[in-house]
Amino acid sequence: MSKPNQLQTVLSVAACKGTRGLLRVTGRGGTALPGKAARVFAKDILEVTSSGMEIIVVTGTNGKTTTSRMLEHALTAAGHECLANKSGANLLSGVTAEITCNATWTGKPKTHYAVIECDEGALKQVVPLIHPKVIVVTNLFRDQLDRYGEVMHTVEQVRMGIQKAPEATLCLNADDSLVASLALDVPNKVVWYGLDTPVGEQKDADISDAKYCIRCGTPYQYHYHTYAHLGGFYCPSCGYHREKTQVAVTAIPKISADGSLVSMRMELPAFGSCPEKSRTCEVRIGLPAVYNIYNAAAAVCAYTAFGLPADEILLSLADVRSSFGRMETFRVGENRVQMILVKNPAGCNQALAYVASLEEDFNLVFCLNDRTADGHDISWIWDADYEQVIARKQGSDEEHAIKVM
């Protein structure tokens, strides 16, 4: 890997900015193609245009976009200039386009901080170029079967990416045995986050993505579950178990359509010198559902591991707003519409659990696509638990009105 010279840099940046400008004039988004154009003149232009930036990378199956949004919102609200790939273009070309288009003509970055959402498969290409300070892994599930195959392939893709960033601090979900396994045999500093409390009821079928110990193959047992294969896992044979968390949700007094109220414990010395050994506080999260509680914990973990004050992100979580399709709410005529994006069984089940918990009546519409960005293989839909919505009840015996369209 060799850095481009000054002429290559100028031509590369010009190609990137020019292509994006042309695409936008013609009414197109211009998210990935400008990056491809930039790399024609300088294959590793991203290493130049990101040089000197402090970067958080967020990867994982579910929650990348929302966790990134929480981090970017906190940085901006605190007065820090921050770059983020809000468009969701999270492959190498998309990341190259976002960072390079926001550089000067000579390739100097215009902002000091960046929050980059990165596809699991692209992590090994992106991180050697941008040298992130922090890498967050949200969770790992079966996803886009035609692209990734089974979940262990995804685990290995992320592992290869982490191995190319030995200086990065890892913020890992302690409740996910697959994510936790990424800490094995790497030199990186690791900070753990998770939920120290169970959530709802658990069905055996929900843990199909990680039933067996990644070390010895014995079926995991659980002290408690949160959802899918996440929770207080341990192996009764070899002793492999959930790690102690430095950022943990210890109680969830309220989950509603307007968001959640949680108690969060932070072991602050994990993030630098601080007179407090630990701190527990009440945190309001402006997005609903259990998985957004996980996203908030991940964001707090990353923000503080980044070296920034915890209060900045704790305050900002109350008014964070959803990204496109992620619990996005809007009006169509007199109707309130909420859009929930799902792309795999685990995400779908959590969305359905949220819908089933709503007290008001509603119409439910399922829309399915099989385009390249979301995967051509849609067989995953047969593994989701739609019955929990149909069977939902209010109180002890009164069924809600629901219309599935």
Where are the regions a protein language model picked out?
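Extended interfacial segments that mediate partner engagement and assembly in macromolecular machines
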Residues: 280-292, 330
